[in-house]
Amino acid sequence: MSVLLPALGPRLVFFTGGTALRGLSRSLTRYTHNSVHLVTPFDSGGSSAALREAFALPAVGDIRNRLAALADSMIPQSVLDFWEMRLPAEGDSEALRARLRAMGSAGHPCWRPLPSVMADVMRVHLGYFLERMPDDFRPQKASMGNLLLAGGYLHFQRNFTPVLSLFSRLLQVRGVVLPIVNACLHLAAELADGSVLVGQHHFCRLTQPVRRLYLTVHEPGRTSTALTPCRPPLSATAATYLQSAGAICYPMGSFYTSVLSNLLPDGVGRAVAAARCPKIYIPNSGKDTEAQGLTLTAQVDMLLRHLQQDAPQAGPGDLLHAVLLDSRHGRYPGGIEWKELERRGIEVVDREMVCPDDPQHHDPERASVALLELVEELRARERVPEAGTAVIPEEDA
């Protein structure tokens, strides 16, 4: 692998969510400061649920998590600790709301460990949130980073661009993080028995195969099967990053909620098909509760099918070039059907990158090096041409 200044490293665009990619994201900052993380904003569980119910906004938890993963190593630990700090999971709601209001004061002890400029910016954004906090807001286990992002998003008229730009500079984020769409939607699934699930947090308890995956404006808890599917447009900023990508990666992570959900907005499949760069899938190793009953080959087929719903004229070779896996240490449902994957025109690339003593997890350093090496190899063999550059517009992400 060529050794480059990270500032000149390749633009790797990930469809991602959750925490599975956190380690690899962190490791990648040693090699490139130009990775782009298109994050799913559809989470409906935990403290995200309280924010979404109160303000009807996209979920910000996965965005917060990825910003922290890409933060420069020289950022004071006290800043990251505050960013990731949570209120207690138990306790009286009014007492916890009072605690939050007290933290809005410049004299509160929570700000003392932080550099003054960083403390000021964070306190201002907490103030934006407190100005709008409903009297019945449920603050249990609330993440401070989530509250700051929500406050900025609301202050800037529901525009992610200013608040993400500001906190990316504050944390010296070595990459780009943005939601795949700016819309308050929920993930839904029609199961094989005809039942319907609404809400990402329900996907960890799938009892039937998923027949159809879609987005909806309906909130979790709705039991009617008459749900209205919604296909929001891919943001123009995300589309431009895809257009100018040095590589596109469908990485490890919960199959439906972290990977496929990002492919549902209108325009994603077409943008991927048009991008002139390597396109790589890194499947999960070990058990993914969301992908029960799906072999590795079936996962590849489902990935392609969701992309082709938006780009029906695209063939497999327009959407996916290689599957990057570890046959020695990895554990893949149904095994590795080499010939079946190659019959689809997809190259199977074998690299040691799964932890030998823990097949559930990839070694972040080995996985990042394997990915970067594969991108270089595909370019060198002219498997796909290298993308050019593009100016990224400033717009409502």
Residue map of PLM features:
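Conserved catalytic alpha/beta core of Sir2/sirtuin-type deacylases, generalized to analogous enzyme cores
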Residues: 1-12, 19-37, 45-46, 146-249, ...
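Electropositive, gly/pro-rich neighborhoods at or near active sites that engage anionic ligands
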Residues: 42-216, 388-396
